[in-house]
Amino acid sequence: MSKQPGQQRPSPISATVDFEADGVQHGFLKLPISNDESAWGAVMIPVTVVKRGEGPTALLTGGNHGDEYEGITALQKLSSRLRAEDVQGRVIIVPMMNTPACTAGRRTSPMDGGNLNRSFPGDPDGSVTEKIADYFTRVLVPMSDVVLDLHSGGRTLDIIPFAASHVLDDAEQQRRALEGAKAFGAPYAIMMFELDAEALFDTAVERQGKIFVATELGGGGTSTPESLAITERGIDNFLVHYGLVEGELQVPDEPQIYLDMPDASCYVQSEHTGLLELTVALGDPVTQGQVIARVYDMTRSGVAPVEYRAERDGVLAARRFPASVNMGDTIAVIAEVVESLG
């Protein structure tokens, strides 16, 4: 169990950049390790800091999961093109939060099996993944005003492109996050319900009173020209909206749709193992009681499939990407349509 913040030692991670210096810096967050391959080694997490004068600080993160490529790619590109003269304040760019997972192309770290987005607030005396989480919680988040964490579905999910905020106790914090999610300019904005939010990066940020916007921008363990274009436009909009970069918001061609996930019944999870057939395409409307998926027994033929039905009206916001499914896997996510924002 993690110690209370007052009992914890300083993070073992050190930065090769000066977060207070004006200009553009590219460097690393260095986490010491010792293993069979490197007795005196380090996990090297790339970081870029772009700063000019006084102003807000935005923390932009990708690679929280290593098989979600839109955020990784878009932030790598941003780190090469964003100039100090473009910025009023400070932009901290970490394209690959969980660098070991990213280099392995896996959701979790090959070093300790850690899922970074289930490891917060972290522990400076814990595993590699817990130490990374701790550094973000106690070093980077406190120096930030707004945080954008870029996700997609990875290898096992495909998700409509959206920016998300959460229901919060602080109404003003919730309002500002929702405005940022809408300003991101993805085809969808959503008020997202998390199945277990306790150890998420989202929660660690929100508990510090910071503005947090998350995204889901595709999936299948790849990226597309369309998903990258949405991601890059959204990052630019985020920086404009929160006053770090001057400019106008880039508005999508089609009206943005605002969705809500009110509770856990939005998630349709399999009670069987077998072959998955989705009967509804991603983004299509569904009605309560409609068959949205079938699971076939793969151990014999001539057996009728098990049907899964929608528990609410809405749109298919996410779906399992592989055709094989195990008991407990999320088959689909259905979100309710609140309004068209066009």
Curated annotation (Swiss-Prot):
Disruption phenotype: Cells lacking this gene are unable to grow on ectoine as carbon and nitrogen sources and accumulate N-alpha-acetyl-L-2,4-diaminobutyrate (N-alpha-Ac-DABA). CDD domains: M14_ASTE_ASPA-like. It is found in: Cytoplasm. Binds 1 zinc ion per subunit. It holds the Pfam family AstE_AspA_cat. This is N-alpha-acetyl-L-2,4-diaminobutyric acid deacetylase. The gene is doeB. It comes from Halomonas elongata (strain ATCC 33173 / DSM 2581 / NBRC 15536 / NCIMB 2198 / 1H9). The keyword NAD does not apply. InterPro entries: AstE_AspA_cat, DoeB, N-alpha-Ac-DABA-like, N-alpha-Ac-DABA_deacetylase. Keywords: Cytoplasm, Hydrolase, Metal-binding, Zinc.
